[in-house]
């Protein structure tokens, strides 16, 4: 495991031995990261977040933060990310809400470009492309190959 000395990894986080974590990245206690994933510098991964294998997060992504929903009151909700996804600079991915299924999900082999946002309770299939600054409001569902 290649972890930069300035990265902050909670001892309760579960990272595969092949995960790479860049400078000043933060990984919280309830995070699981699968084999071959790369967490770039200044990326923050928190919340109840599960990241599959071979995912790449470019600098300044915010992953697994609380949903931007006025009804959210700190309930334990989740973010689940499949395998082989690429998240470019400054992407934000929020957890779900109890008013819906309680989980935000992204499938496999998605390409999420810079400054895109995937809000609470979104269900994104596999092989999707979200262009720069694309924003999915809460509860949006995208099928595969969108």
Roles of regions detected by a PLM:
Residues 2-146:
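Structural signal for interior beta-strand "rungs" in well-ordered beta-sheet cores
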């Amino acid at each position: 495991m290649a972890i930069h000395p300035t990265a902050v990894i909670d001892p309760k986080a579960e990272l595969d031995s092949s995960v790479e974590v860049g400078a000043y990245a933060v990984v919280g206690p309830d995070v699981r990261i699968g084999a071959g994933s790369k967490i770039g510098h200044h990326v923050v991964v928190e919340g109840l977040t599960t990241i599959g294998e071979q995912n790449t997060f470019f600098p300044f992504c915010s992953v697994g933060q609380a949903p931007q929903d006025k009804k959210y009151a700190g309930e334990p909700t989740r973010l689940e990310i499949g395998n082989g996804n690429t998240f470019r600079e400054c992407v934000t991915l929020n957890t779900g809400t109890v008013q819906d299924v309680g989980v935000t999900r992204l499938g496999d082999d998605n390409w999420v470009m810079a400054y895109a946002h995937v809000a609470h309770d979104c269900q994104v299939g596999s092989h999707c492309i979200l262009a720069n600054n694309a924003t999915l409001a809460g509860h949006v569902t995208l099928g595969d190959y969108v």
